[in-house]
Regions:
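Extended active-site neighborhood of metal-dependent phosphoesterases/phosphodiesterases
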Residues: 1-68, 87-115, 123-165, 169
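Short, well-ordered beta-to-alpha junction loops that form the rim of enzyme active sites
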Residues: 37, 75-80, 120-121, 174-175
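Short, high-confidence coil segments that cap the C-terminus of an alpha-helix
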Residues: 68-70, 267
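Active-site segments of SGNH/GDSL-like serine hydrolases
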Residues: 70-86
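Binuclear metal-dependent phosphoesterase catalytic core
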Residues: 133-206, 210-217, 256-265, 269-285
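Extended low-complexity, serine/threonine- and proline-enriched intrinsically disordered segments
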Residues: 210-235
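Aromatic sugar-binding surface patches on proteins
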Residues: 231-260
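Short beta-strand edge segments in extracellular beta-sheet folds
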Residues: 287-290
Length: 290
């Protein structure tokens, strides 16, 4: 409700149709919590990422019923963390794109093995926040509001799949129309505007526990180097088609799950091997031509 004077009344219509905006339930050995971290500031469409004291008090009491050490899944819209925070560039965080009082949520989740599931941003990102705390930021199936085949970071249209076994959680990203093993894209030398001399891999579900290795003509060359830049496919697509986009502000965005390696020769065979957090290995090959 955009014509109300405060956040307290902004969900009246939603609640009348769908019920509460925060709640919890158990399924199997997992405790699930849904939170509402969009705080409407009663000015146009503007909001900030914020958990009200009412929700924090409720969550504190809710978690008292959960055995310490068990797995808790917490879902919300706006992410708690950001790429700026990971780089310790705190002043560059946008109040509209991150939960501003996240430290108080983290404190409540300390006794548990917690997975935070969020969205909002049109890219895929994962944050290992602590040994027991992990945040999954999900790229939307709609990519760039249905304007492109990829999200702004080059993640193909798709969805996350989570597999629960007792208190254990495994996950992978499933691209629409692609096999489960399609977990990264490999670009040839010259495709990347940031690393023109290198082959580049976009590993969209990467986190710090993954390994990205490369081989040239079968020789192990070690790990590829991670860098920030634009995914070649979405960048080129937006350059060619952005004039037809419904929303003119849409475009490619810099991502941090890119990796590069510079081949020694121009006609070598390149193989990239990606190992995920579960030990699954994904491989792609590319034959270079002079």
């Amino acid at each position: 409700d955009l014509n109300v004077r405060s956040n307290e009344h902004a969900r009246t219509t939603y609640k009348s149709y769908y019920g509460p905006t925060y709640y919890s339930f158990n399924r199997g050995d997992i405790h699930y919590v849904v939170l509402d971290d969009i705080f409407f500031i009663a000015k146009s469409y503007l909001y900030v990422g914020y958990l009200t004291e009412q929700q924090l008090q409720w969550l504190e009491q809710d978690l008292k019923q959960v055995t310490p050490g068990s797995t808790v899944v917490v879902a919300m819209h706006i992410p708690t963390y950001s790429r700026e925070a990971r780089r310790k560039e705190w002043g560059k965080e946008s109040t509209m794109k991150v939960m501003n009082n996240r430290s108080h949520l983290y404190e409540l989740l300390k006794p548990y093995n917690a997975h935070i599931m969020s969205g909002h941003e049109h890219y895929n990102e994962n944050y290992v926040l602590a040994d027991n705390l992990y945040e999954h930021v999900h790229a939307p199936l709609s990519t760039l509001f249905w304007q492109a085949p990829w999200a702004c970071d080059g993640t193909p249209g798709g969805y996350a799949v989570y597999e629960f076994d007792g208190g254990k959680v495994n996950w992978y990203y499933k691209c629409v129309g692609k096999d489960k093993d399609y977990q990264f894209e490999l670009y040839p030398v010259g495709a990347s505007r940031n690393k023109k001399e290198a082959v580049v891999a976009n590993v969209w579900n990467y986190d710090s526990t993954w390994k990205v290795k490369w081989y040239e003509n079968g020789i192990d060359k070690g790990e590829m180097i991670r860098f920030s830049g634009y995914d070649p496919a979405i960048y080129e697509y937006c350059e060619k088609n952005s004039s037809t986009f419904k929303h003119k502000y849409l475009g490619a965005d810099i991502t941090e799950h890119l990796f590069y390696a510079v081949p020694e020769t121009k006609d070598s065979e390149i193989r990239v091997e990606v190992t995920d957090h579960c030990g699954n290995v994904y491989t792609r090959k590319m034959q270079q031509s002079k």
